[in-house]
């Protein structure tokens, strides 16, 4: 399940892509299969990075014209030279970082001029509901330390000499799932409603029936769990 729409980045062959906060590699693999690129996935969590490494062979096209590599790093201190990457993806990361301004500075620094940047964070309203339903959700180690408003995040990037391109929201059907998890936080693993809704989401991702695709499209503006914003560095 990808949050960033890879198509909207207009990936060109012979480019470098950084997925900052790559997790288990979902966006890395999507970019890798899209064009002849050098894709770099970096995350603070070594366990997630190892899972990405372990998962890559099923996507490996064994081509001399593309590559995909992984490593660990701190988003506030990236080990790359200025203007290294043509494209930068940062999906569901900034809400975890206390020193978020330093992380955004680094994102801009390592992106080339005219390079594309795609950032996603939890949308304000669905996230606010989660925080309201469960204090434990807020206090999860390594969890979310802030709730972004769309205009706040957009301004944060634009003032660093970047041009806004477009935005959209994703995963509306996932918002009720997280609300249920927060409502039954201490017993979520045993909750009938949580488990059944999870089964529904898995079924939906596998089958993609028209009715749920249509329903999610209609609900995105209201409860889309993630807000995705695309920029170009001036």
Regions found by a protein language model. Give the residues of each.
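Conserved SAM-binding loop
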Residues: 3-129, 229-232
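Short, hinge-like loop/turn segments at secondary-structure boundaries
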Residues: 57-59, 135-138, 182-186
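A conserved catalytic-core signature of glycosyltransferases
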Residues: 75, 143, 148, 226
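Short, glycine-/aromatic-enriched active-site segment of Class I SAM-dependent methyltransferases
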Residues: 122-146, 155-156
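A C-terminal cap/extension of S-adenosyl-L-methionine-dependent methyltransferases
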Residues: 132, 171-234
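A structural motif corresponding to the C-terminal end of an alpha-helix
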Residues: 156-162
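Conserved S-adenosyl-L-methionine
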Residues: 162-172
């Amino acid at each position: 399940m990808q949050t960033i729409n890879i198509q909207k980045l207009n990936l060109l062959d012979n480019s470098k892509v950084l997925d900052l906060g790559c997790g288990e590699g979902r966006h890395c693999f999507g970019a890798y299969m899209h064009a002849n690129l050098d894709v770099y996935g970096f995350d603070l969590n070594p366990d997630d990075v190892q899972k990405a490494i372990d998962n890559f062979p099923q996507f490996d096209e064994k081509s001399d014209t593309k590559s995909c590599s992984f490593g660990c790093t701190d988003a506030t201190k990236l080990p790359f030279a200025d203007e290294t990457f043509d494209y930068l993806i940062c999906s569901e990361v900034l809400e975890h970082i206390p020193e978020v301004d330093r992380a955004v500075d680094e994102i801009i620094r390592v992106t080339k001029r005219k390079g594309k940047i795609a950032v996603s964070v939890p949308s304000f309203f669905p996230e606010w509901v989660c925080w309201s339903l469960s204090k434990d959700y807020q206090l999860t180690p390594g969890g979310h330390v802030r709730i972004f408003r769309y205009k706040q995040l957009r301004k944060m990037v634009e003032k660093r000499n970047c041009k806004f391109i477009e935005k959209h929201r994703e995963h509306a059907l996932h918002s009720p799932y997280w609300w249920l998890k927060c409502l039954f936080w201490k017993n979520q693993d045993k909750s009938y409603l949580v488990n059944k809704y999870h089964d529904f989401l898995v079924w939906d991702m596998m089958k993609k029936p028209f009715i749920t695709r249509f329903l999610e499209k209609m609900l995105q503006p209201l409860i889309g769990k993630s807000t995705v914003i695309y920029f170009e560095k001036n």
